[in-house]
């Protein structure tokens, strides 16, 4: 018993030894296996012929097994080809080496034995892995040939340790012996894919298996060997914008024909070479890996476009333009090195020959009918999309930052606060409405120290050029601030309106019973210079005297009527220049917001002298009274004049301790609303104002209220007539030329009129005007000096010569003027119509829908909504000239890019057409795939047409195909 037990214990050891031996045998050709694992796969056509294929193949048995089998699962571990749920079979005996629960089971594929039709799992690349069931099946059953279910292009022979060619020569013709097997595999793959997707959704596991990872799925038509395999691309770090564009470029037939032609003999630059490798990895016979790593190509591209380095999110349309431009520039540089001239017919680059089209812009003048046509090349059409304007938001009250109140200034008790009124502009008069609604006037009388307050009726106000008039709100503001002192800035007059009651209460608190009148002893010509004035204040009340004010008003009117203009001119000549300049500037400001009658009276001359009468002020008026005549030769006055001018311009800071600078009062930073585009910062996470730098407006929706928005509608809007007017008016060359000729004619005519008028002034032009050349010829014949009759003729000849010389001078002068006029550029702006049409249709039409926009504030927004598009589109109605001999511009959809999310963060996915080359308009023979980075799944055409497309790729249908 013990010996038997020992023999049984040795059996697994032998099995392990055989496995190790098989492992060594499988690793004997490291060059081939290593190259395949790295993705640098040689073409299957270059492999050697297998001597076991004809002997071992049992085609009938394999076909019967495929037709009779219900599920495609591994016979050892019961792992499905699509589900991969990781369930163990009863006969697996719980071995960990072959269990599907192994994390490496996701890298397995189903292989079909070509001798018995058994399904076994193995490696995705090659079936000779050390822990694959297909290797164990071959070792146990001695079966040598297998084919991969997910990619029938892979046929493997275990004794030869190499891939089998797809086609085999038979009587000089290349045929695929396994074509029937491949057709059955393809039919079963599509059916199982649909049923597996339905089961996963019903069982609730759709979160994992709804995005079926078709690693190396067969998407090419084997009969048409120019198809390709849709394979995922590794996300290198927020590179979905790059992967979505590359999936569409890899699906274009024209690019594939160029890069795969003659095995890539025409090697280009580094960017084109790395792109050729990507196309090679998508060949059907090279589908040995599930996912392609585009790191080499992306690094080569970033060397030419460094703005895409890093891990930031970018726009896929921007990347497409930069990529095409880089490829075209690289090819042009190589052609220059090779000495290819630009005039050669083949000088167009690959990108221009595939994506290049041409538009014609026709502009017609609405005045003369002249039209101009300009041709512009394009690589893609950017079409604007109509959108719904967001409803206007309710106006929110603008919360302006309140002025920081300064601490009260300490003033000696014996000095009344009223004395600070002396810092106000000399002779300033404030008017305000009292509680009874009548106007309360403050008058400044230079003859008396007492102030008077009286209600006034509204009446005309006499103004002078040196009087500044402000509105009622400004007057009340200045009156309310008179108790705290004038801060030296006219900006204080701009502020909220203060009622008369509040002002009176504030003034009573300061010990002022009524508005105060300042007596000016010495007046300086500057609004902010403190004058030598005294203000009478105290407990005495100011009594109003309406009759006295009316009498003063009548005296003022009489004084104005009796003024003489000479006195006015003399008085103006004695004024200081700086003062007059400031007065003129202030008088212009006084016209703003004042009554028409007041504005007219402001143009009158200042009639006031030293003994001026009190001035009557109407409502809503603030007047700066005129100043005394002071000679500008005084140094102190000169300094004050300089201070006055600098105060107006804001270039001088007074040294007065009571001065408060409000120059930056309105320099508040503009705050923006809305979310921010870009990665959030720490300030944003904590709620700090990150919004102030960049923001994102609310997402907008496509306007489909009138008609459903479609690509055809966007093309119609792109090619419709546009009226150019106002600032966008067109510079019509024909109108400019006509105007130029008209001006030359007028100039020539005026020169002729001037020459005639000058000759007429000599008195003899009319007499000899008709004789002209005849008299000159006669004078030329009479050349005998002895003849006395010739004297008069010679004198007349001199006059004739002078006349001819002057005429020549005028003619040369006119010609010179014409030359000068011809050199002048005359531009005439005319209203015109503009229409853009497609003049040359490209082989691959790229349509970019403008879903991203930026407003005037710099806020970014995305336009959400579906834009309808068709699988087949006809551009004949958008062409400039109708197609006669060439193929009509009919296109078929090849792929698209979709963006989901917002401006802050989103994701790009690609929808591409897989399978055979498009030869017919029938879409039933092709399959569509949704590719999201490394994940690939098959979708229906209806789902593709309902996606929110951002970039569309259309391939032109040619009759010769």
Swiss-Prot record:
Its EC number is 3.4.19.12. Zn(2+) 3 binds at residues 113, 116, 137, 143. A zinc finger (UBP-type) spans 48-183. One of its GO terms (molecular function) is zinc ion binding. It is an enzyme of class 3 (hydrolase). InterPro entries: Papain-like_cys_pep_sf (IPR038765), Peptidase_C19 (IPR050164), Peptidase_C19_UCH (IPR001394), USP_CS (IPR018200), USP_dom (IPR028889), Znf_RING/FYVE/PHD (IPR013083), Znf_UBP (IPR001607). Residues 1-11, 400-412 have a biased composition (Basic residues). The active site is at 240 (nucleophile), 907 (proton acceptor). Zn(2+) 2 binds at residues 74, 77, 121, 133. It holds the Pfam family UCH. Zn(2+) 1 binds at residues 50, 52, 157, 160. Residues 231-957 form the USP domain. It catalyses: Thiol-dependent hydrolysis of ester, thioester, amide, peptide and isopeptide bonds formed by the C-terminal Gly of ubiquitin (a 76-residue protein attached to proteins as an intracellular targeting signal). Keywords: Hydrolase, Metal-binding, Protease, Thiol protease, Ubl conjugation pathway, Zinc, Zinc-finger. GO terms for cellular component: proteasome complex. One of its GO terms (biological process) is protein deubiquitination. It comes from the Eukaryota. Residues 790-816 have a biased composition (Basic and acidic residues). Belongs to the peptidase C19 family. This is Ubiquitin carboxyl-terminal hydrolase 2. The lineage of its organism: Eukaryota, Viridiplantae, Streptophyta, Embryophyta, Tracheophyta.
């Amino acid at each position: 018993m013990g010996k038997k037990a020992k023999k049984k214990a040795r059996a697994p050891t032998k099995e392990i030894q055989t496995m190790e031996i098989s492992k060594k045998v499988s690793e004997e050709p490291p060059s081939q296996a290593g190259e395949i694992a790295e993705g640098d796969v040689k073409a299957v056509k270059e492999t050697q012929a297998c001597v076991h294929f004809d002997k071992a193949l049992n085609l009938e048995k394999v076909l019967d097994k495929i037709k009779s089998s219900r599920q495609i699962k591994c016979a050892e571990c019961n792992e499905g080809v699509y589900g991969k749920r990781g369930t163990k079979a009863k006969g697996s005996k719980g071995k960990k080496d072959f269990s599907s629960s192994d994390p490496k089971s996701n890298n397995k594929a189903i292989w079909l034995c070509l001798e018995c039709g058994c399904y076994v799992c193995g490696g995705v690349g090659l079936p000779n892995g050390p822990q694959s069931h297909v290797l164990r099946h071959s070792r146990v059953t001695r079966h040598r040939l297998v084919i991969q279910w997910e990619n029938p292009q892979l046929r493997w022979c275990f004794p030869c340790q190499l891939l089998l060619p797809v086609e085999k020569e038979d009587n000089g013709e290349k045929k695929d012996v396994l074509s029937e097997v491949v057709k059955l595999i393809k039919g079963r793959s599509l059916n199982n894919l649909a049923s597996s997707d339905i089961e996963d959704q019903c069982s609730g596991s759709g979160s994992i298996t709804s995005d079926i990872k078709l690693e190396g799925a067969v998407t090419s038509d084997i009969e048409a060997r120019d198809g390709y395999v849709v394979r995922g691309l590794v996300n290198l770090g927020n590179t979905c914008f790059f992967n979505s564009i590359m999936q569409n470029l890899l699906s274009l037939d024209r690019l594939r024909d160029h890069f795969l032609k003659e095995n890539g003999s025409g090697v280009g630059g580094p960017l084109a070479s790395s792109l050729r490798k990507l196309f090679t990895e998508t060949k059907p016979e090279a589908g040995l890996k599930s996912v392609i790593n585009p790191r080499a190509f992306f690094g080569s591209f970033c060397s030419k476009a460094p703005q895409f380095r890093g891990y930031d999110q970018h726009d896929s349309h921007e990347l497409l333009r930069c990529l095409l431009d880089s490829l075209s520039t690289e090819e042009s540089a190589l052609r220059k090195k090779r000495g290819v001239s630009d005039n050669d017919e083949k000088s167009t680059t690959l990108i221009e020959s595939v994506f290049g089209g041409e538009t014609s812009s026709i502009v017609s003048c609405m005045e003369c009918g002249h039209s101009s046509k300009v041709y512009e090349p394009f690589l893609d059409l950017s079409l604007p999309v109509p959108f719904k304007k967001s409803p206007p938001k309710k106006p929110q009250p603008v919360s302006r930052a309140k002025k920081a109140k300064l601490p009260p200034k300490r003033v000696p008790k014996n000095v009344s606060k009223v004395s600070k009124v002396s810092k106000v502009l000399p002779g300033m008069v404030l008017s305000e409405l009292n509680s009874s609604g009548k106007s309360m006037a403050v008058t400044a009388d230079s003859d008396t120290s007492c102030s008077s307050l009286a209600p006034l009726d509204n009446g005309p106000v006499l103004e002078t050029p040196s009087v500044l008039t402000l509105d009622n709100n400004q007057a009340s503001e200045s009156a309310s601030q008179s108790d705290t002192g004038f801060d030296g800035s006219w900006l204080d007059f701009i502020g909220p309106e203060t009622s008369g009651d509040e002002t009176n209460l504030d003034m009573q608190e300061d010990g002022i019973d009524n508005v105060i009148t300042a007596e000016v002893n010495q007046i300086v010509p500057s609004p902010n210079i403190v004058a030598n004035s005294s203000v009478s204040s105290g407990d005495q009340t100011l009594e109003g005297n309406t009759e006295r004010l009316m009498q003063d008003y009548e005296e003022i009117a009489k004084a104005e009527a009796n003024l003489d203009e000479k006195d006015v001119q003399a008085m103006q000549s004695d004024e200081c220049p700086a003062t007059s300049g400031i007065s003129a500037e202030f008088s212009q400001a006084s016209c703003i917001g004042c009554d028409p009658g007041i504005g007219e009276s402001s143009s009158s001359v200042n009639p006031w002298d030293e003994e001026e009468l009190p001035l009557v002020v109407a409502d809503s008026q603030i007047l700066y009274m005129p100043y005394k005549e002071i000679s500008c030769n005084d140094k102190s006055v000169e300094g004050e004049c300089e201070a006055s001018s600098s105060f107006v311009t804001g270039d001088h800071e007074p040294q007065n301790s009571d001065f408060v600078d409000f120059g930056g009062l309105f320099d508040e930073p503009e705050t923006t609303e809305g979310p921010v585009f870009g990665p959030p910062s720490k300030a944003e996470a904590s709620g700090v104002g990150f919004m102030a730098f960049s923001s994102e407006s609310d997402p907008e929706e496509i306007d489909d209220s009138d008609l459903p928005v479609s690509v055809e509608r966007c093309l119609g809007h792109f090619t419709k007539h546009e009226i150019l007017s106002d600032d966008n008016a067109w510079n019509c060359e024909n109108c400019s030329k006509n105007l130029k000729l008209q001006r030359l004619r007028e100039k020539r005519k005026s020169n002729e009129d001037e020459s005639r008028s000058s000759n007429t002034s000599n008195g003899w032009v009319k007499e000899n005007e008709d004789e002209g050349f005849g008299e000159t010829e006669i004078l030329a014949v009479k050349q005998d000096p002895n003849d006395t009759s010739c004297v008069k003729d010679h004198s007349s000849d001199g006059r004739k010569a002078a006349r001819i010389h002057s005429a020549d001078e005028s003619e040369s002068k006119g010609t010179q003027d014409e030359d000068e006029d011809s050199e002048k550029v005359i531009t005439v702006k005319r209203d015109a119509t503009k229409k853009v049409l497609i003049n040359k249709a490209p082989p691959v039409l790229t349509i970019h829908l403008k879903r991203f926009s930026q407003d005037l504030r710099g806020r970014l927004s995305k336009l959400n909504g579906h834009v309808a598009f068709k699988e087949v589109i006809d551009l004949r109605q958008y062409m400039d000239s109708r197609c006669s001999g060439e193929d009509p511009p009919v296109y078929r959809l090849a792929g698209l890019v979709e963006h989901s999310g917002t401006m802050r963060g989103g994701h790009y996915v690609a929808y591409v057409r897989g399978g055979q080359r498009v030869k017919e308009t029938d879409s039933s023979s092709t399959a569509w795939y949704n590719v999201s980075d490394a994940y690939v799944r098959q979708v229906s055409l209806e789902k593709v047409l309902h996606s929110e497309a951002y970039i569309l790729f259309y391939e032109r249908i040619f009759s010769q195909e």
